[in-house]
């Protein structure tokens, strides 16, 4: 029969690739086995493994003593049992009944089975319908488990759904079914091609792909944990109307951090702004507190309340007192100072303060007072420390207005640009370079000679006397004198413009192209070619570039140089070129054309013949 070919292969020796081949072969034999399709109910019911537990006690009567659950006597055999059991209750003793059934496995009960085979097939058909509608294995959970532990032969009856009897010659289809599906009873129902399709992907290496996916997703999980674990003092920039503070379970009241995932500082009332873990949780190892991670400082602007301490055990710094009262924090607040806020309430809105980050008044330069001793309050800008440019500009403006409104008693000319002191009194100062100096302070930067009433040179707001200034100047490479005016630099050297000339024509090369020979002498281009250019072997003139050209064109023949217009035949004077009939045909060191060369050869040949 072709029924076993429909079942999925369970033996490990058979490769999975043969399953489709079997399916194709089964389809080819499907037409002649249509009559066998009526026998499909036994095929579906066979994996129920009902006969297996019944066969185990009969196979090994003196073995390990497999326990057979005491089922009630079958209803069909109730007529035959009273003669044996008498008035015993439905569950008879297991050992006696097992031996009795074992004593006649092929006797009367087997004959009744064979005689009522048709009736059993009908009952199996009805049972198959019931199995398709509901779970077919509920009536025999203990029998299936008992049958899975033993290893009975492959002979299992198709009709043993209720009776505890095993035939010796069961149908071939039932035998193969029980062999193919001994343990996975829940998957034995769908016998058609569909189970084969479902069993195909099972042997595939699915775990390898999942392992790769889990490996790749692990770094993502770590990143998520880190991003979800801000430091206890991290706070995003609060939006308008949003206030952050410390609640009853915040870090203001508990010195120990709650967990690796730190919640926002507080919740208000019953509103769920953020989840706060219970105080009993301990910090997870590996997710310690990073003091500088994600901390946001606004040291000079008014915003929400303060941040937490410098470590997990320090309390938070909160604003205390009236919200509109600004109070300088004297340094480090004691641990008990952070518990001023009542539990469950937000701290009062006020200027944000952070430890160590508030600017101190030391870096701010104290206001300079006039030398006359006048002093006064300059306003709040001199009291409140600030480093912003606009605040500094405002401070200087107020300072200037104060100096203008409160001049000193004596004649005040300003502050000295050299020493920074006030210049007070007539005859004590002078003005130079749009600045005010004391007479004793306005000196040469090199020799310290007083420059009042003397000519001086100002270089980058520095005063030089004339001798010192001249000594700082560069000297001309030609005349070796200091260059007081415009400097002309060439070949890495400094020149006076009138000293930078050609060594041959002696004209100034200021703004004119020039070149330098091997000895470092400066030449104009024309004189350089006249001096160093190759000379024509005909006219003996230097071969120079044409006017307006930068390249020199010359002809070299017989190791001699020629101008283009000088490259001619010595006899006829014809212009020679690279043409076929206009090439150079030298003879005895003479440059000749082809015609003249042939004529000279004939003459020489005739003369030689005459001499002979």
From Swiss-Prot:
* Tissue expr: Expressed in a wide variety of tissues but no or very low expression in brain and peripheral leukocytes.
Instruction: Using the record's annotations, give every residue carrying the modification Phosphothreonine.
Output: 333
Q: Which residues form the LIM zinc-binding domain?
A: 414-473, 474-534, 535-603
Q: Where is this site: Breakpoint for translocation to form HMGA2-LPP?
A: 371-372
Its annotated function is as follows: May play a structural role at sites of cell adhesion in maintaining cell shape and motility. In addition to these structural functions, it may also be implicated in signaling events and activation of gene transcription. May be involved in signal transduction from cell adhesion sites to the nucleus allowing successful integration of signals arising from soluble factors and cell-cell adhesion sites. Also suggested to serve as a scaffold protein upon which distinct protein complexes are assembled in the cytoplasm and in the nucleus.
Organism the protein comes from: Homo sapiens (Human)
Q: Which residues carry this modification: N6-acetyllysine?
A: 108
What result follows from mutating residue 610 to A? Abolishes binding to SCRIB
A GO MF label: metal ion binding
Q: What is this protein called?
A: Lipoma-preferred partner
Keywords, sorted A to Z: Acetylation, Activator, Cell adhesion, Cell junction, Cell membrane, Chromosomal rearrangement, Cytoplasm, Isopeptide bond, LIM domain, Membrane, Metal-binding, Nucleus, Phosphoprotein, Repeat, Ubl conjugation, Zinc
In terms of InterPro entries, this protein maps to: Znf_LIM
A GO CC annotation recorded here is: plasma membrane
Please give the clinical condition linked to this protein: A chromosomal aberration involving LPP is associated with a subclass of benign mesenchymal tumors known as lipomas. Translocation t(3;12)(q27-q28;q13-q15) with HMGA2 is shown in lipomas. A chromosomal aberration involving LPP is associated with pulmonary chondroid hamartomas. Translocation t(3;12)(q27-q28;q14-q15) with HMGA2 is detected in pulmonary chondroid hamartomas.
Record's compositionally biased regions (Low complexity): 41-53
Give the similarity note.
Belongs to the zyxin/ajuba family.
Q: What segments bear the compositional bias annotation Polar residues? A: 26-40, 143-158, 171-181, 209-219, 314-323
